[in-house]
Amino acid sequence: MAKNILLLNGPNLNLLGSREPEVYGATTLADVERAASEQVAQAGAKLTTFQSNHEGALIDRIQAAKKEGIDAIVINPGGLTHTSVSLRDALAAVAIPFVEIHVSNIHQREAFRHHSYLSGIAVGVICGLGTEGYAAAISFALKKL
């Protein structure tokens, strides 16, 4: 059976390509999703994408993933990384292995960005590779999860 991967993007990631391009680059979320779809299709797997600026919508999507038979999640939680116990609890509750990704290196930024509520339960964390980090996370999910 083909792998089924869910790519989740949190608040403000819909602004990739225009928001602080010196930090996040010029690649748009549509570009990221298109490249991810091609990468997953080449592996004979399925990709579902979802972006929301709302914590509850992301939690609802994570909970739905369990019923859909999602095998792995790649998530860029954006600013919710540093604030959302509820997002962590949702990921823990569904017990779907996930990779946390950040376009920028959160450890080189403001002190409040250094802590992640998700990394302690993630299979892996990728940060600072720009949007290329998505491809690395998806590659890992396809091969290892």
Swiss-Prot record:
GO molecular function, one term: 3-dehydroquinate dehydratase activity
Binding site residues for substrate: 76, 82, 89, 103-104, 113
NCBIfam families assigned: aroQ, PRK05395.1-1, PRK05395.1-2, PRK05395.1-3, PRK05395.1-4
Protein name: 3-dehydroquinate dehydratase
Ribosomal protein listed as a keyword: no
Family per similarity comment: Belongs to the type-II 3-dehydroquinase family.
EC number: 4.2.1.10
Superkingdom: Bacteria
Gene3D superfamilies: Dehydroquinase, class II
UniProt pathway: Metabolic intermediate biosynthesis; chorismate biosynthesis; chorismate from D-erythrose 4-phosphate and phosphoenolpyruvate: step 3/7
